[in-house]
Amino acid sequence: MGYPVIVEATRSPIGKRNGWLSGLHATELLGAVQKAVVDKAGIQSGLHAGDVEQVIGGCVTQFGEQSNNISRVAWLTAGLPEHVGATTVDCQCGSGQQANHLIAGLIAAGAIDVGIACGIEAMSRVGLGANAGPDRSLIRAQSWDIDLPNQFEAAERIAKRRGITREDVDVFGLESQRRAQRAWAEGRFDREISPIQAPVLDEQNQPTGERRLVFRDQGLRETTMAGLGELKPVLEGGIHTAGTSSQISDGAAAVLWMDEAVARAHGLTPRARIVAQALVGAEPYYHLDGPVQSTAKVLEKAGMKIGDIDIVEINEAFASVVLSWARVHEPDMDRVNVNGGAIALGHPVGCTGSRLITTALHELERTDQSLALITMCAGGALSTGTIIERI
């Protein structure tokens, strides 16, 4: 039996739709980050990519250039050792987080000693839902009679459930942008970012032959309450706008897991462990309210209360998702998404779970704290939850 620990974690910058990373093939983007996480760990230790036994990656839209087991294709595209196995999983927006649960589980079971959990979504190049085909009605049997709304309607139902107003979500959206701006100004993301070389595209999205080094998240916007108030709701009569919803984005992230004894034998310092993990089903009627349940589950498994948690990274799919969770669990909001979230930074869906774990780890280290909760809503009325502890 093994004892899984995180020894390295990194992510690409997040590019906005048709932005800085959109000229890069999805396999090149993920492969660059897979290689970066091993390189960063191996600089001091002599760890090599060939020491990795398995890679598990999350990807939501497994279609086109994200099909055919992208975790494996990306690994080979990056020139990494062919004997390393790879699997790609779809747990909707929780894919990248569930990949970490699975790799940690393999190590705990003694099946492997070294593994990478990662996530990718190049949403500029592979549109969300493209894998469903032209007739989305085929996804569900004719006998399906469950009220599972689309994500936009779900966000509005959650808002009504908790009495969340337009002003509430606008205030939250503004704060996400403010915190992200502060984080970048203070260099808080510098250690977790692996810069990416990407082709430059012209106005017709054609390569110019030039390349740029992308080292910063692109989605941050100058925002005011007045400006947010002028935005039109996505749904008529709704409260969510483009300023209070997650962005369509491109990005990848990777976390290197090892058995603790093996890590120490390589001269690597274990940085964090999983205290508790969960994947739960939530109420289909509300679809995206699952972080309420997954948080309760991991806190129960860990024997903790929300006040024991130092840092929370909860995905900002929509502002109401976070605000609903907060009204139930009553956290100190100064500990929640302290460096902004998907409203400001972006949400490359298959990547985000690994990105949140990466960000949470680095923020714990920056502030010399111990415990972080990472949670997300996911399509199909699912939610992932993880508590990690610094070692």
UniProtKB/Swiss-Prot annotation:
CDD domains: thiolase (cd00751)
Induction: Induced by cholesterol and repressed by KstR.
Annotated catalytic residues: C93, H347, C377
Keyword terms of this UniProt record: Acyltransferase, Cholesterol metabolism, Lipid degradation, Lipid metabolism, Steroid metabolism, Sterol metabolism, Transferase, Virulence
Protein residues bound to CoA: Q151, R221, E222, T223, S246
Disulphide bridges: none
Annotated positions binding substrate: G379
PROSITE patterns per UniProt: THIOLASE_2
EC number assigned by the record: 2.3.1.16
Top-level enzyme category: transferase
Record's catalysed reaction(s): an acyl-CoA + acetyl-CoA = a 3-oxoacyl-CoA + CoA; 3-oxochol-4-en-22-oyl-CoA + acetyl-CoA = 3,22-dioxochol-4-en-24-oyl-CoA + CoA
Gene3D superfamilies: 3.40.47.10
Gene Ontology molecular functions: acetyl-CoA C-acyltransferase activity; identical protein binding
Biological process, per Gene Ontology: cholesterol catabolic process; fatty acid beta-oxidation; phenylacetate catabolic process
Pathway membership, UniProt: Steroid metabolism; cholesterol degradation
SUPFAM superfamilies according to UniProt: Thiolase-like
Phenotype of gene-disrupted mutants: Cells lacking this gene display an attenuated disease phenotype with reduced colony-forming units in comparison to the wild-type. This mutant is unable to metabolize cholesterol to androst-4-ene-3,17-dione (AD) and androsta-1,4-diene-3,17-dione (ADD).
InterPro entries assigned: Thiolase, Thiolase-like, Thiolase_C, Thiolase_CS, Thiolase_N
Protein family membership: Belongs to the thiolase-like superfamily. Thiolase family.
Subunit structure: Dimer of dimers.
Reported function: Involved in the beta-oxidation of the cholesterol side chain. It is important for utilization of cholesterol as a sole carbon source in vitro and for full virulence in the chronic stage of mouse lung infection. Catalyzes the thiolysis of 3,22-dioxochol-4-en-24-oyl-CoA to yield 3-oxo-4-pregnene-20-carboxyl-CoA (3-OPC-CoA) and acetyl-CoA. Also able to use acetoacetyl-CoA (AcAcCoA) as substrate.
Listed name of the protein: Steroid 3-ketoacyl-CoA thiolase
Organism: Mycobacterium tuberculosis (strain ATCC 25618 / H37Rv)
